[in-house]
Amino acid sequence: MLTDAGYRVETYLFNPTMRLSDDCELNKQRLLHMEKIEFTEVVDDFVPPELEERDVVIDGLFGSGLNRPLTGGFAAMVRYINQSDATVVAIDIPSGLFGEDNRKNDPDAIIHADLTLTFGFPKLAFLLPENAEFVGEWKVLDILLHPEIIASTPTQFTLVTEEDIAAVFPVSYTHLRAHET
């Protein structure tokens, strides 16, 4: 954990409805029992900490199921983070970004991540050039999805990688650029 590596960790749980999913409640209870982590549950007014260039914000405000633009305090929080000089790491998907079509989204209410760590597969939104400013660099974390689950999941998309291209066109890069010398 970050605290074991000597980092100071502050965690904020935004809970204006005072209702949490079972998973969220379980994780809240875990955090409450961790001595080295400062935990704040925000249910009313919130005065955000001052963010500096040396800070890292780990964005887990909203996940991949979001289907409407952020508004109110959540949009204000996103704008505050985006205006800071802190490094931003988004978990799964930058908060405020829809997983696919963002044409009806509010770009001012989407986290601008420096790095996005996503699970299993990249979201379609990561591959669209208009979302690069929100996603930043992205990495897929293997969560050991069963191959049968992957094969049985319907999709109309196929991700073509450099390895796929190299298998079809096994010409080396130097041969492709030979005309430039």
Language model regions located:
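A cross-family phosphate/adenosyl-ligand binding-site feature
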Residues: M1-V56, N67-G72
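YjeF_N-associated NAD(P)HX repair module
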Residues: R54-R177
